[in-house]
Amino acid sequence: MSSNGSLTKDEVVNIIKDWNFSWSIIFLLITIVLQYGYPSRSMMVYVFKMFILWLLWPASMALSIFSAIYPISLASQIISGILAAICAVMWLAYFVQSIRLFMRTGSWWSFNPESNCLLNVPIGGTTVVRPLVEDSTSVTAVVNDGHLKMAGMHFGRCDYDRLPMEITVAKPSVLIALKMVKRQSYGTNSGVAIFHRYKAGNYRRPTIIQDEELALLRA
């Protein structure tokens, strides 16, 4: 450092080198999460993505509060205070909606920050729950060699002949029921079925068996 307190050229270059390595790792992780962070691709990466999204609210609020307490100017203090209030209100709204959805479904997927829709499919005496990113009046089920996929997501093993006749989509304010309207087999224990919305109401979905749900998430 020079006598007047400013950094020398070599010190600036060394700092850039250090941060360049760190940011290269950070951006690589962000790229992986954005590229593969979908339930239809990798459930493990998707859960990691949800964890990062969940941490962004308190991190944003903490930074805004810190900027409001230690401002660089009066304008930045006012703006930081407004941003902190907005973060707090939105985070509270997220928890309210998530708790309402949890009371309706009993699934920890209710706290998914990316979606407030849950697809509930009864299979083999339990109900498998997956987050539904896109809301739709119809859902397509594909069974390939005894393995079920719905809305692009894996639901584990399920025989084509044992497909449920009704599935549900849960939201914080409503539970939507979809019934099978068409099915077509195309091989041994394989086929396609279409479920279409036919009723909605303010009622709860039957509780799930948590251990089996977690086991399916790890599958």
Curated annotation (Swiss-Prot):
The cellular location(s) given in this protein's UniProt record come to:
Virion membrane; Host Golgi apparatus membrane
| Underlying gene | M
The record's listing under InterPro entries reads:
M_CoV, M_MERS-like-CoV
Q: What is this protein called?
A: Membrane protein
Organism encoding this protein: Bat coronavirus 133/2005
Virion surface face residues: 1-18, 71-78
Residues spanning the membrane: 19-39, 50-70, 79-99
What family does the database annotate? Belongs to the betacoronaviruses M protein family.
Tell me, what does this protein do in biology? Answer: Component of the viral envelope that plays a central role in virus morphogenesis and assembly via its interactions with other viral proteins.
UniProt keyword terms in alphabetical order? Glycoprotein, Host Golgi apparatus, Host membrane, Host-virus interaction, Membrane, Transmembrane, Transmembrane helix, Viral envelope protein, Viral immunoevasion, Viral matrix protein, Virion
Which Gene Ontology CC terms are recorded?
host cell Golgi membrane; membrane; viral envelope; virion membrane
Q: Membrane topology type, per the record?
A: Multi-pass membrane protein
Q: Where is it chiefly localized?
A: virion
Q: Which residues lie on this side of the membrane: Intravirion?
A: 40-49, 100-219
* HAMAP family referenced in this protein's UniProt entry, alphabetically: BETA_CORONA_M
For molecular function, the Gene Ontology terms on record are:
structural constituent of virion
Q: How does it assemble?
A: Homomultimer. Interacts with envelope E protein in the budding compartment of the host cell, which is located between endoplasmic reticulum and the Golgi complex. Forms a complex with HE and S proteins. Interacts with nucleocapsid N protein. This interaction probably participates in RNA packaging into the virus.
